[in-house]
Amino acid sequence: MTIEPRATADLVDDIGPDVRSCDLQLRQFGRRPEFAGRVTTVRCFQDNALLKSVLSEPGDGGVLVIDGDGSLHTALVGDVIAALGRDNGWSGLIINGAVRDASTLRTLDIGIKALGTNPRKSTKTGAGERDVPVDFGGVTFTPGDVAYSDDDGIVVVTP
């Protein structure tokens, strides 16, 4: 199911004071600055095996929200994992953590927002949780919500 991106500023105006807008100032990395889709979540800390497994599945235009607990010590997503998500139909990634291969990420047709970069690899033990509510930036991202992302920020809506 494809969900068309909408301007987050317009969503804020439409929703009003109860809007769920992420307060973290995430940076744009992927080639697609505007993206939207149903939320799937992963919570992991400096380990990207679980999120790679999720991105190996059909994304159906969804958005994978990855809560890496704000760690910038290792990158959770690099060019290989981002390309996997793109190839499997994910519209975007929202990462409370770091990425690497930033120059290559800018060429991939997928939305990617993250805190920053670090060239260091993550571990790959599979530690983490999937499809659980995750909280960062003053927002709870719940599986099945819809996330809208653009240059102004991220808005989350419960359908």
UniProtKB/Swiss-Prot annotation:
Cofactor descriptive note: Divalent metal cation.
PANTHER family in UniProt: 4-HYDROXY-4-METHYL-2-OXOGLUTARATE ALDOLASE 3-RELATED
Similarity comment: family membership: Belongs to the class II aldolase/RraA-like family.
GO-annotated biological processes: regulation of RNA metabolic process
Keyword Metal-binding among UniProt keywords: yes
GO molecular function: 4-hydroxy-4-methyl-2-oxoglutarate aldolase activity; metal ion binding; oxaloacetate decarboxylase activity; ribonuclease inhibitor activity
Protein's name in the database: Putative 4-hydroxy-4-methyl-2-oxoglutarate aldolase
Annotated residues for binding of substrate: G78, D79, V80, I81, R100
Organism: Mycobacterium sp. (strain KMS)
Subunit composition and interactions: Homotrimer.
Protein purpose: Catalyzes the aldol cleavage of 4-hydroxy-4-methyl-2-oxoglutarate (HMG) into 2 molecules of pyruvate. Also contains a secondary oxaloacetate (OAA) decarboxylase activity due to the common pyruvate enolate transition state formed following C-C bond cleavage in the retro-aldol and decarboxylation reactions.
